């Protein structure tokens, strides 16, 4: 799914991060440049820090880091021929998609957002299906244990 996303959106690299551990749980099939991974991980740290300082809701409760959270940051240290932009979108409360995009492609942000929304929908369906399979398996195990208990 990430390969389709990056090819359709002209994204250079995409990471799906666990926001809490800042470890990527998925990436596209292209090789991982550790410098890119580190800068993407640091972006999550920065956003969490800023959210904790400025993002508390009016009731003083939860964080404002939600499904509408996103960030676009231009990297100044990048190669002059390679104007890279970091783009973060929250997938759910525990996952964030962080992409490296050529600055010339960010003008098509509406297309990128549309494709990311489709990616999020696909990921949600996978998680729901996985949950259904896990629940069915757990029910089968419970029935099996009950039957075994009756035999004893």
Mark where each language-model region is:
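Non-catalytic interaction/Regulatory regions outside core domains
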Residues: 1-152
């Amino acid at each position: 799914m990430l390969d389709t996303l990056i090819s359709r959106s002209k994204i250079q690299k995409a990471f799906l991060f666990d926001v809490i551990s800042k470890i990527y749980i998925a990436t596209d099939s292209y090789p991982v440049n550790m410098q890119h991974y580190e800068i993407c991980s640091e972006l999550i740290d920065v956003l969490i820090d800023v959210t904790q300082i400025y993002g508390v809701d009016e009731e003083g409760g939860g964080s404002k880091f939600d499904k509408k959270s996103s960030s676009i940051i231009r990297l100044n240290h990048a190669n002059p021929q390679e104007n890279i932009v970091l783009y973060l979108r929250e997938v759910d409360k525990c996952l964030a998609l962080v992409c490296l995009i050529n600055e010339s492609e960010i003008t098509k942000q509406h297309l990128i957002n549309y494709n990311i929304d489709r990616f999020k929908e696909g990921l949600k369906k996978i998680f729901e299906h996985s949950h259904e399979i896990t629940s069915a398996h757990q029910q089968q195990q419970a029935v099996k244990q009950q039957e075994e208990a009756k035999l004893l």
